[in-house]
Structure formats: C-alpha cells, structure tokens
Design a protein with these regions (language model features):
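Transmembrane alpha-helices of multi-pass small-molecule transport proteins
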Residues: 2-15, 62-116, 175, 213, ...
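Juxtamembrane helix-entry segments on the extracytoplasmic side of multipass membrane proteins
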Residues: 29-34, 65-67, 100-104, 187-210, ...
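Glycine-/small-residue-enriched transmembrane alpha-helix faces in small-molecule transporters
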Residues: 2-74, 193-225, 278, 282, ...
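Membrane-interface helix-cap regions at the ends of transmembrane helices
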Residues: 80-101, 178-195, 242-276, 282, ...
Length: 386
C-alpha cells in the first residue's frame, strides 16, 4: 500500500512538473511572438516613407498620386512574394500554393484580400472624402483611425473565440482607444476638416474592421481549422494571391478611378527605367515582405490581440524615421511631427508596452517577480515527443 502511495505521488509530481514546463513554454512562445510583432512594426513604419527618398523628377509623375501609391503597393506585393519564394525555398513555396485545392485555403485568399486590396480601396475612398479647410483631401485622420483595428481585434477575439484578456490588457486598450480618438479629433479640428468628412472617417473605421477581420480570420485558420495552416503557408498564399490581383487590376483600376483609361494603369511600370525609383521601390517591397513574415509569426504564436497591438509602435517609429529623413536632407520635404502628436503618442507607446508585457505581468503576479524572471531566461528541457 505504501509503495502504491509513493508511486502515485511521484506520478503526480511528474505531471505537475510537466504542466509547469508546458506553461513556461507557452509563455515564452507568446512573448517571442510579440517580439516579432514589435520588430515588424519598424519595417511597416519605414516602407511608406521611402517614397520621400526618391528624387522629385518630372518623368515619375506625382509621387503622391493614387496611381503611384497603388503601383508602389503592387511592387511591394510582388517583391514580398519573391522574397518568400526564396526564403521558404521554391519547392516548399509551390507546395504551399498546392493547398489551394482545399476549399478552406480560399479563406486565406478572402481574408488576405479584405486586409489588402479591398482595405486599400476603402482607405483611398476615405481619404478622398476627408476634406480640409483648403478644399483638399487629407489622409491624416483616416490613417490614425486605422489603428482602432486593435480594439476591434480584441473585442472580436472575446466574442467569437472566447479569448480572455487580463485587466491590464483591457485597461491599456481602453486608454489607447481614447487617445487615438482624441488625437483624431484634435487633428480634425487643427486641419479644419469639413463636417462632410465624417463619411470618410466612417470608411476609415470600416477599413480598420477589415484589418481586424484579417487578423482574426487568419489566426483562426492557423490554430483551429481542420488543416491548421502554418504561418509560412498562410503568409505565402495571402501575399502571392494579393500580388496577382494587384498586378492584374491594381494600377488599371486606380487609373480608371481617377479618370484615366484602364490601360494607362500599366504605363506606370515604365518608371522602372529610372534606376533610383526602381531600386527604392524594390527595397521597400523586400522590407515589407520581411515585416509581414514577422507579423504572421507573431499572429500564430501570440494571437490577434497581441499582434495588432504591437503595430501601435508604428506611432513611435514613423516620426523617428521622419526626423532621420529630415536630418539626412532627403530630396522631398518631410513634415516634422507637431508637439501635440507626442502628447498622445507617449501614453500610447506606454500602453503598447503594457499590452506586450501582459503575459509576463499576469504570470509574475501569480508566482512572484523573481520566479517569473528566472523562468523567462532559464534553460528548460525540450518538450517530449512521446
């Protein structure tokens, strides 16, 4: 009898140790994913600003024109696809695309379109409907409102996937949302936006919803679907399908939308004859592709709420790169962020830190700070495959 009791105690102890190690592995995986997301925010911040590096020459046309912006996005998608083709190895990449024979895989294409080409169209419309006091369009406020996809993703995770967020996360999300809305209202007043611009702001919120839907849908497909796609498969299928759509219809539709012929949209590709223009856009595509790969690694490891929240760090990195470009005297004029921008952004960055540290904070509150730090860095045995 005594031997049986001792055996049961040893088995229970082994089970408890295994559960503790599994918990530590899960926490580490989430934290590592969040780090990937934070790094991806750096790349996503610099890519849009790279157009300022291109010398202002007549042959390029207006670099700020929608058709040029659409061309930039199209090349980004193509270069990102090429990067993944090389990085994941051609054979693996082709095998990823073969998954399209499964109906479930087409959901990746759908969510990719919603968070890619469709979102871009809605954002362009929101900019066109946002009118400043001079009668021109203004994309500042719509761009700020896109960041509300974080709260949409958190609410969506809670409603549809019964995800549980800690009090730290909800508090930081609520504060961030208020700050983003406050900053948007401040900019709207400062720029003297017309009341008719409310329509554009509503479209920006719809666009934010599309980004949240992409994060939620892709996360579900990678964790709970029948196939359980890897992040490599998901990001490759999403990017290549978006590249094909943008290549076929991106610039032509943008041309038609702005009163040019459908075929005029393809003429923009002639700009590749100007090497400085081409090299910068190709480099932007590689940076964007690398950032997207990190973003999807974060999505599969940490979930949609943490992933979208890491992108709030773009509020910090974008002005930092603006200051760098100003100091480097890039060919095009870069506007310096206003003083009140930082009044809103510093608390948002702090909230991003709180959300990103949530897993560690919750765990530390249960086991103590010393043990939590020890578990974060101590070497643990590899997980048994038995």
């Amino acid at each position: 009898m005594a031997d049986q009791v001792n055996t049961d105690q040893l088995l229970q102890k082994e089970k408890n140790v295994k559960n503790e190690l599994d918990t530590i592995r899960t926490k580490r995986r989430i934290i590592l994913g969040i780090m990937y997301g934070l790094i991806s925010a750096v790349g996503y911040s610099i890519v849009p600003l790279m157009l300022y590096i291109i010398p202002e020459k007549v042959p390029y046309g207006n670099l700020a024109a929608p058709i040029n912006a659409t061309f930039y996005v199209t090349v980004q998608e193509i270069m990102a696809t090429f990067l993944m083709f090389i990085f994941y190895k051609p054979k693996n990449f082709i095998n990823f695309l073969k998954l399209l024979r499964h109906k479930e895989t087409w959901l990746i294409v759908l969510y990719g379109y919603l968070g890619g080409p469709v979102a871009m169209v809605f954002f362009q419309l929101s900019v066109l409907l946002t009118i400043n006091h001079q009668g021109g369009t203004d994309g500042t406020v719509p761009g700020l409102l896109l960041n509300l996809n974080v709260i949409f993703a958190a609410v969506g995770s809670t409603i549809f996937f019964r995800a549980r967020q800690s009090k730290y996360t909800w508090t930081a999300l609520a504060i961030s949302t208020c700050l983003i809305l406050g900053m948007s209202i401040h900019f709207a007043i400062e720029e003297g936006l017309a009341w008719s611009s409310i329509g554009g702001m509503c479209l920006a919120l719809v666009t934010a919803g599309f980004y949240a839907m992409e994060a939620l849908g892709m996360s579900h497909l990678m964790s709970s679907s029948k196939i359980k796609f890897t992040n490599h498969e998901t990001v490759s299928i999403k990017t290549s399908s978006s590249a094909i759509l943008m290549l076929l219809l991106g610039t032509p539709v943008a041309a038609v939308f702005f009163h040019q012929s459908f075929w005029d949209g393809y003429k923009i590709f002639a700009n590749f004859q100007y090497y400085d223009y081409a090299l910068i856009i190709l480099a932007g595509g590689i940076i964007m592709g690398s950032s997207r790969m990190l973003y999807y690694a974060c999505l599969v490891m940490s979930g949609p709420t943490y992933t979208t929240s890491t992108q709030l760090l773009m509020f910090f990195w974008t002005p930092i790169f603006q200051y760098i470009f100003i100091a480097a005297h890039v060919p095009n004029k870069v506007s310096e962020p206003t003083w009140y921008y930082w009044v809103y952004v510093i608390p948002i960055v702090f909230c991003t830190f709180i959300i990103s540290s949530n897993e560690f904070l919750v765990h530390a509150s249960k086991v103590g700070w010393k043990r939590a730090f020890h578990e974060l860095f101590v070497k643990i045995p590899k997980q048994s495959t038995k």
